[in-house]
Amino acid sequence: MTTFEEAAQKVKEFTKKPSNDELLSLYGLYKQGTDGDCNISEPWAVQVEAKAKYNAWNALKGTSKEDAKAKYVALYEQLATKYA
C-alpha cells in the first residue's frame, strides 16, 4: 500500500496533467492531511486560483488528518491509472 508521503511525491511525477478539479481535490486533501482545518482568511473573489484552493481545503473542515491522508492516497491511486 502506498503511504501518504509516497503518494504526495508520486503525484508530482505524473506524466500527464490531471484536470483542475482533480488537482483541487488533491490540494484540499493534502492541506487537510498536513495542516488540519483551513486556517487562512478567505481570499477575495477576484483571486480566482487562491479562492478555488481555499474552497477545496475549507470544504474538508472537520475531516481528521488521518482520514484526509487516506482519501488522498485513494485518490492518488485512482488518478495514477490515468496519469502516471
UniProtKB/Swiss-Prot annotation:
Residues 1-84 form the ACB domain. Binds to acyl-CoA. Processed into the SDF-2 (spore differentiation factor 2) a peptide which triggers sporulation. SDF-2 appears to stimulate prestalk cells to release additional SDF-2 by acting through a signal transduction pathway that also involves dhkA, regA and PKA. Induces encapsulation of prespore cells in a dhkA-dependent manner. GABA induces the release of acbA from prespore cells and induces the exposure of tagC on the surface of prestalk cells where it can convert acbA to SDF-2. Glutamate acts as a competitive inhibitor and is also able to inhibit induction of sporulation by SDF-2. One of its GO terms (biological process) is culmination involved in sorocarp development. This is Acyl-CoA-binding protein. Interacts with dhkA. PANTHER family: ACYL-COA BINDING PROTEIN 1, ISOFORM A, ACYL-COA-BINDING PROTEIN, ACBP. SUPFAM superfamilies: Acyl-CoA binding protein. Belongs to the ACBP family. Disulfide bonds: none annotated. An acyl-CoA binds at residues 12, 27-31, 53, 72. Pfam families: ACBP. The gene is acbA. GO terms for molecular function: fatty-acyl-CoA binding; protein kinase binding; protein kinase inhibitor activity. One of its GO terms (cellular component) is cell cortex. The keyword Secreted does not apply. InterPro entries: Acyl-CoA-binding_prot_CS, Acyl-CoA-binding_protein, Acyl-CoA-binding_sf, FERM/acyl-CoA-bd_prot_sf. Disruption phenotype: Cells form fruiting bodies with a reduction of 90% of viable spores and without SDF-2 activity. Diazepam (Valium) can mimic SDF-2 in Dictyostelium bioassay. The keyword Electron transport does not apply. Keywords: Cytokinin signaling pathway, Developmental protein, Differentiation, Lipid-binding, Sporulation, Transport.
